[in-house]
Amino acid sequence: MEEIKVNVELREKAGVKGVLSAIRAEKKVPAVIYGGQKEPISVSITEKDLKAILKAGSNSVVTLSTPAGKETAIIKEVQYHVVKDTPNHVDFQRISLKEKIDVVVPLKLTGESADVKIYGALINQVLREVAIRALPTAIPHEIAVDISALTIHKAIHISDLSLSKDIEVLGDPERAIVHLMVPREEETVAAPADTAVQPESSSTKGKKDEDGALAKDKK
């Protein structure tokens, strides 16, 4: 995994609303560096550098250069503005390149199942990320899940993932990731034809009887 290097600035009066607003007005994002049995450090990072880290992919290893020294970290959380959807705050977690860490990695479907083309089967991805344990440099940005051989009524489970031996998957190995569903056909039931014989009304029957009687008298 490529290591990213950026400069961050120390910030004072952490958490003060006016200070945070001033930082954001300068196209910077407030952040904190924590973990590693050290005291947290309040810093700020430019929006440009943060976007570069996020573009590189989740769980990217970042070297943060501060006036107090260098910190090796990964992004643990990004908070976004509820309206503008812009980064509002970033949490960086200190890491050691020699120690395994637990992270969550996205699952990306690849390939195309023949049953989707032939039968119109629907793809139902029930698990979109998985927790793993690995050295920071061995952590993938995403894990590919090939559905080319997937058929109807079958599923791909966590245990079916093809991963490096350096990566340990956490959680239930039998948990399903994706399966194919048969589309439910709408059955159209035709309404039965109205073939029942309608009973004659009393007035009609009386008229027929009267006509019959008159015909006999004429004879």
Swiss-Prot record:
One of its GO terms (cellular component) is cytosolic large ribosomal subunit. It holds the Pfam family Ribosomal_L25p. SUPFAM superfamilies: Ribosomal protein L25-like. GO terms for molecular function: 5S rRNA binding; structural constituent of ribosome. It comes from the Bacteria. Keywords: Ribonucleoprotein, Ribosomal protein, RNA-binding, rRNA-binding. GO terms for biological process: translation. Residues 206-219 have a biased composition (Basic and acidic residues). Residues 188-219 are annotated as: Disordered. NCBIfam families: bL25_bact_ctc. Belongs to the bacterial ribosomal protein bL25 family. CTC subfamily. PANTHER family: RIBOSOMAL PROTEIN L25/GLN-TRNA SYNTHETASE, ANTI-CODON-BINDING DOMAIN-CONTAINING PROTEIN, RIBOSOMAL PROTEIN L25_GLN-TRNA SYNTHETASE, ANTI-CODON-BINDING DOMAIN-CONTAINING PROTEIN. This is one of the proteins that binds to the 5S RNA in the ribosome where it forms part of the central protuberance. Part of the 50S ribosomal subunit; part of the 5S rRNA/L5/L18/L25 subcomplex. Contacts the 5S rRNA. Binds to the 5S rRNA independently of L5 and L18. This is Large ribosomal subunit protein bL25. The gene is rplY.
